[in-house]
């Protein structure tokens, strides 16, 4: 229940205010309040974002109720989504009615259960109450006659921002005006070199820069500017002063700050992320709240005497009565003849069995149906076969759901074994491309890099390459500067019009050819030299982390990753380490289609480093001493899986043995067929696409190069499960590109350490991806990022709708919906399936408190495939 926007004249009582707040305490309040938002990475390094990561100590149901209460955000699937899933046959209604019976068993009532059950079953149809019934004079008269039924009133337990309770004389909520101002200042401060003029005094901090400029802001009234001019110069003091002026009691400060953070969770999220990146900005979130709440005081100050913070909201009787008449077959006359006690009980049942609970029961049945069908698919394909198959090549892919169809097609095409592992390949590294001083943390975002790896070339080749790259960069930079300059922007259309006009025509009508031409032209011009890596340990004066690895670290990382892959024996002549990347044009969300395990970057860099390490004689000697013997004729190579076009690009091929060369030739021979089949399967799932494609590969390339294409691929939509086990468990299953697949052999993991590492790393990445897609589907207006066609890239950080919206944090509408009315992504919580004996799962849950909390509180689902008892839900 959201707070009413009606303002009463009852002032907040003075005795409720206890502003004995020390400035040093305010940071503790801010830190505690930050649990309600999640860090938001810049869109150029888009990383999956679990919106409720700080709330996992509460159950999913509690968080759903809380969000509905304080923000009116519903995070259960809508009735239309449930109806669509039912039409598609994705919900077994036996699970629905089993859930209903469990709910009825948990309730206590004094009327016949059969009567309640009939009502509930009818209400589960999720049809709307007829409007003529809700508006009927007889029903409203009956509601007025029922006395003392709705005796319970609900006091709002969280302090809403005062600005959200007030409207100005133009009937505009003051919260909207406040948001407009805060967005403006956030864009100015956080701008990542997109604008030509930087915010003055930005280097001194957000609050200081704002305080310096606010007295000149023409969007504020003269009185507001004067009041803020005399405001404290320190952010902590300003925040304490604002809370005191607004008369927020100390016991409500945290919830009041939470309300403000949830008002613009995108901007607050990227500020939270920035605060964790450097010591200099560690208090940035406090500064943000100081700016926001100081401005709130200035805007609402004339209205403060009118605000009532303790609003109560009564439950409306009319829809409860209507529900029993519509679904319970009770007439108004029968209602009139009931005793007050019976009326109260029926209304209480209707109140508790509300639409949110009904949709929750359907949603849980949807999840149970998915789990049941997945278990049937897996168990029905199991057979005992101890015969070792001949394997010509082993190919390790990222666990990404887009790898599953490609791996399936590869295995059908030849004697190949595919392996699933997180696409950073166990290397906790930050990577620096050739000639770049910038490094990118190429590992899951919840981890920190321990080593920096630089791409190297000879001095002469590097110098020549950097010169060509500088020319390439200068052209685009000059164009940008001319476009933003007051004078040259007038001349630019005349100079560039003919060229840009031709480019527009070519981009629109022959996108594949033009894209290929531009890419080849740039590649020819840059002529990137052959490179190597700084793999050997060296102290880095530019960074806190060292360059390269020691000999022991090289051996340890390779050993750990090979064990995670379950690849410690029976090596094929060729082992291919496959990272993955995407390809799209005019797409701000390009990084969202890259490797999540590599922090939103392509995985080829990590793949090449790992393959190189595996080929080093010193590493092989170290592995051999620990019992992992790699044959001399086994060679590790690296490739990159292009998910948008389902092709494999070789990025590292060392000198090959004869058997490895044979394997490579075989892979290259079957790759066109594999790509054709994988593209055909994937493209058929795109909306409004022809069912018969003459050339799927050509169509896939057109999607990748077309600058008007809002959906070059589905990304990780429809992800629903994370399966940890041997490939034989799922090899004969068509998992429809919905499963993250990670290899695991419990027989080689007596201690359980490997399983714990998989859950803590890749398992967490998969959960974050799953919940980001979930949130963007069920609450796109709050957790999604809107329509790609109307987005505005702002401040070099992310996207907005228009020029004054929240910084949008989720995936776009086109990534989860196949039409305006039909969702493509199924909003189901991630089902983690572990192939291991039950005692392994019990040990994992006992040792890993965080994971146990996720399972117990309903943030993930858990099942296991026990070699003795089969499938088991936990």
From Swiss-Prot:
Q: Which residues cross the membrane?
A: none
Instruction: Return the InterPro entries for the record.
Output: DabA
Broad class of where this protein is predominantly found: membrane
Q: Name one GO cellular component term.
A: plasma membrane
What does the function comment of this entry state?
A: Part of an energy-coupled inorganic carbon pump.
Membership in a protein family: Belongs to the inorganic carbon transporter (TC 9.A.2) DabA family.
**What is the protein's name according to its record?**
Probable inorganic carbon transporter subunit DabA
